[in-house]
C-alpha cells in the first residue's frame, strides 16, 4: 500500500507563493493589456485638419488623444499651453486627479512628474512661469471632451494644470477657462486609471508625450 505523503509547511507556502505569482503574471500580461484591445488609436498624420497649427496630440498608454485648441477664445491660456507642450514640460507628467466618468486632470510640473512624484503635494505644484489671468466667457459650452485650465478656488491662478471632461459640465461655463476640445480619442480617456473612491490617484497613469502637430 502506498501511503499519502503529507506536504510540509514550507512546501505549502511555496505552492501558495507560486499561485500568487501566477495570478499576478496573468493580470500583468493578459488582463491589463486588454483595456487597450478594442480602443482605436488615431494617427493624426492620416487626418486632414482645417488648422493643423492648433492641433495637439496627447499620447498615453492606449493611444493618441487629439485636441483642437481655442486660440481665438482663450489666446493667453493657449499660448501658455502651447509653450509648455513644445518645450516637453508635460511629458512624463501624471494624471494625478481622475474622477471616474467626470474628468481627468494633469499638468502638475512640480510634484506630478514620473521621476519625482510627490503624493503629499501633487495637485498643488506650479510650472515656474507664474500664474496667468482667467479667460472666462459665457458662450463656450463645457461639454464632454472639453479641455480647460485648472485653477485654485480663486480666479487668475491658472498655470500649467489642465483637465479634460468625461461628461458635460454646464456649471463650468463662465467659471473656468476653455482651451480646447478632444476631437479624436475620447474613448482613450476612459482607460486612464481613476482614483475611485478618491479623486487623487495612487500609482497613476502618465502622459507619455504631448506634442503639437505642427511646431
Description of each model-found segment:
Residues 1-215:
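Cyclophilin-like peptidyl-prolyl cis-trans isomerases
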